[in-house]
Amino acid sequence: MAVQQNKKSRSKRGMRRSHDALSTAQLSVDATSGELHRRHNVTADGYYRGQKVINK
């Protein structure tokens, strides 16, 4: 089992975690339906960049 050699300070722990924050999702409005969707993702009705890509 791994055991640390020395105790890491609160500062070192915070520095390591400084890149762990989540950013908010980027949203766009679909040109054809006006639906709000995540950027670079297909909308719920199957459109991507104004073209139908998924047939249900």
UniProtKB/Swiss-Prot annotation:
GO MF annotation terms: structural constituent of ribosome
* Highest taxon above the source species: Bacteria
User: Residue ranges of region Disordered?
Assistant: 1-37
Where does the record place Polar residues bias? 21-31
Task: Name the GO terms of the biological process aspect.
Answer: translation
Query: Which keywords accompany this UniProt record?
Result: Ribonucleoprotein, Ribosomal protein
Any Pfam family hit: Ribosomal_L32p
Q: Name one GO cellular component term.
A: large ribosomal subunit
Does the keyword Ribonucleoprotein belong to this entry? Answer: yes
Does this entry carry the keyword Ribosomal protein?
A: yes
Q: Where is the composition biased (Basic residues)?
A: 7-16
Q: Which HAMAP family match?
A: Ribosomal_bL32
Q: Which PANTHER family match?
A: 50S RIBOSOMAL PROTEIN L32, LARGE RIBOSOMAL SUBUNIT PROTEIN BL32
The Swiss-Prot or TrEMBL record describes its family as follows:
Belongs to the bacterial ribosomal protein bL32 family.
Protein's name according to its UniProt entry: Large ribosomal subunit protein bL32
Organism listed in the record = Shewanella loihica (strain ATCC BAA-1088 / PV-4)
